[in-house]
Amino acid sequence: MSDTTLEKIIVLDYGSQYNQLIARRIREIGVFSELMSHKVTAKEIREINPIGIILSGGPNSVYDEGSFDIDPEIFELGLPVLGICYGMQLLSYKLGGMVEAAGEREYGVAPLQLTGKSALFAGTPEVQDVLMSHGDRVTAIPEGFHVVGTSPNSPFAAVENTERNLYGIQFHPEVRHSVHGTEMLRNFALNICGAKGNWSMENFIDMQIKNIREKVGDKKVLLGLSGGVDSSVVGVLLQRAIGDQLTSIFVDHGFLRKGEADQVMETLGGKFGLNIIKVDAQKRFMDKLVGLSDPETKRKIIGNEFVYVFDDEANKLEGVDFLAQGTLYTDVIESGTDTAQTIKSHHNVGGLPEDMQFQLIEPLNTLFKDEVRALGTQLGMPDEIVWRQPFPGPGLAIRVLGDLTEEKLETVRESDAILREEIAAAGLERDVWQYFTVNTDVKSVGVMGDQRTYDYTLAIRAITSIDGMTADFAQLPWDLLQKISKRIVNEVDHVNRIVYDITSKPPATVEWQ
């Protein structure tokens, strides 16, 4: 964020699978936090002006050649520093301590025994469960440090040098398995770093509106509106900031959920007054996809065609200088650090032609998904948009296995509407992370009205998750599943069988394609 007066704690990224959680937990306390590359220098940190620094965990060994390092001048800034797991080992190693391979690795929940008073552990019990996940351990601490906590396999599980405001813990306070981890992070942020804890979504809105107005001035902004949560929130935020200087292009490719296109136009165009150019490109997309079965081919064609349609419409407009996107903080982290690995491609408007000379505006690029929903609520947006299900860019087209036909597409659109209606009626729409139907491209024999049928089998996929990285299948009530199945078979043509996907992630992904 550009505002250097904002209280913030930065997290240096050393590759831990939990590093995003650290920033999230600090934000939940009411202090803004963001991840930064471990390559950041002390000089750059001075310019950022944080009130504290956290060193994340990571998979490396600090004593190996080429392991992720730190500018040693960072320890001389006079800022509170908290090292977590690898971060603790790095802090100890760089300041003269010793780190070696543990004789016995420590993975899972372990009891932490506090051995002395510490501001970091204020208000937490003397013995508490914490999550350990390390193959190395500190075997000698630097001069000026003393031990405040031990575990069965880590004699230096928590250490500190209060004179220099340096703290190290071998475990992960950011995960829920560390029962009092949030209290430790709160102690670090509020008591040790001296944060006021007053960062809120309301403050974020005021700051972003100010930033947008300063950046845009009297120029025009173009937004690719998908109807999803992210682009919708961007649209409403920009509308509040710059009003009629914003033009949104909404491409209806024909693979949206039932009633979605109309809802976007009525809510965002009507209630919130966005200037929306709706492009009906359903035939254009379908003509390109009819008969195709390979999911990657479908994705590429839809992505490319979207770019062409968007480009055609953008070229009709004059005097547009800025392009707005709904990029989230998770996208920035995945693409912007040297510790991240790409698992699958995104479907955002990221592949726009290079000759479209726009400056980017990404007002959500410091927010996580749950924070975007909170922002939408703060902006007065209705729940049906704010809590809309995550939806892939290619839409329902990748929820049809095998060759894509209008008939199969309609089975998914209608059955999905029934599923969403019944989940909402049961009051479970916020308990289930994501839910949808899939046309499996499998036909089976059935009997309906005393006649033999040979129709499609649809699958219901419903999952529970915290962050979407891992997921369990949702254990929906049997009577609810029975009701959904009965409605789909009776109300949706060409369907005679429903199955329920009971696979977790991993090994499966959320989507079938």
From Swiss-Prot:
Enzyme Commission identifier(s): 6.3.5.2
In which pathway is this protein known to take part? Purine metabolism; GMP biosynthesis; GMP from XMP (L-Gln route): step 1/1
Query: Pfam families, from UniProt?
Result: GATase (PF00117), GMP_synt_C (PF00958), NAD_synthase (PF02540)
Question: GO terms for CC?
Answer: cytosol
Q: Which ranges carry the GMPS ATP-PPase domain?
A: 199-388
**What is the enzyme's main class?**
ligase
Q: Report the SUPFAM superfamilies cross-referenced here.
A: Adenine nucleotide alpha hydrolases-like, Class I glutamine amidotransferase-like, GMP synthetase C-terminal dimerisation domain
Query: What does the UniProt keyword field contain?
Result: ATP-binding, Glutamine amidotransferase, GMP biosynthesis, Ligase, Nucleotide-binding, Purine biosynthesis
The positions annotated for binding ATP are S226, G227, G228, V229, D230, S231, S232
Instruction: Output the InterPro entries linked to this UniProt entry.
Output: Class_I_gatase-like (IPR029062), GATASE (IPR017926), GMP_synth_C (IPR001674), GMP_synth_GATase (IPR004739), GMP_synthase (IPR022955), GMPS_ATP_PPase_dom (IPR025777), NAD/GMP_synthase (IPR022310), Rossmann-like_a/b/a_fold (IPR014729)
Where are the active-site residues found? C85, H172, E174
Q: Where is the Glutamine amidotransferase type-1 domain?
A: 8-198
Record's catalysed reaction(s): XMP + L-glutamine + ATP + H2O = GMP + L-glutamate + AMP + diphosphate + 2 H(+)
> What superkingdom does the record give?
Bacteria
Q: Which CDD domains match?
A: GATase1_GMP_Synthase, GMP_synthase_C
Q: Does the keyword Ligase apply?
A: yes
Concerning HAMAP family, the annotation shows:
GMP_synthase
Assembly and oligomerization: Homodimer.
Identification of the protein by name: GMP synthase [glutamine-hydrolyzing]
Protein source organism: Lactococcus lactis subsp. lactis (strain IL1403)
